[in-house]
Amino acid sequence: MKHGPIILIEDDADDKDVFQDILKDLKVFNPVVWFKNCDEAFSYLKTTSDQPFIIFCDVNIPGLNGIECKRQIDDNKELRKKSIPFVFCSTSVDQKTVDEAYTKMTVQGYFQKKNTYTELKETIKLIVAYWEECKHPNTK
């Protein structure tokens, strides 16, 4: 298992708790660094020496939304070098937003939050397994 922290950008504390419970059930023991907004996450990403394993981000967040957050990361030369996998996981899946995520930035996935724990667990399991196997510039 890649050991970098999993970054979760999610304003809903209940969703954060479910996400952490799922990772525990999946025996994924990477630390989870949780941010309620994109400004805090962006500040952390610019200053940390950690190489995060993956970023899970909601789209609908107060302040800078998830799309704008990803655009900010893409526009930062140092963060682009880190090649951190970035996945949207959101209840918002309108086609316009999905299209924008894939055509105007470098997003690695866009997933709808599932309605049940079991379905969401399966989605997160697939995402984590994929990125565990995937090679990218900062694979260690």
What residues fall within each predicted segment?
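Active-site residues of response regulator receiver
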Residues: C57-P62
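Acidic catalytic/metal-coordinating carboxylates
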Residues: N37, N65-R71
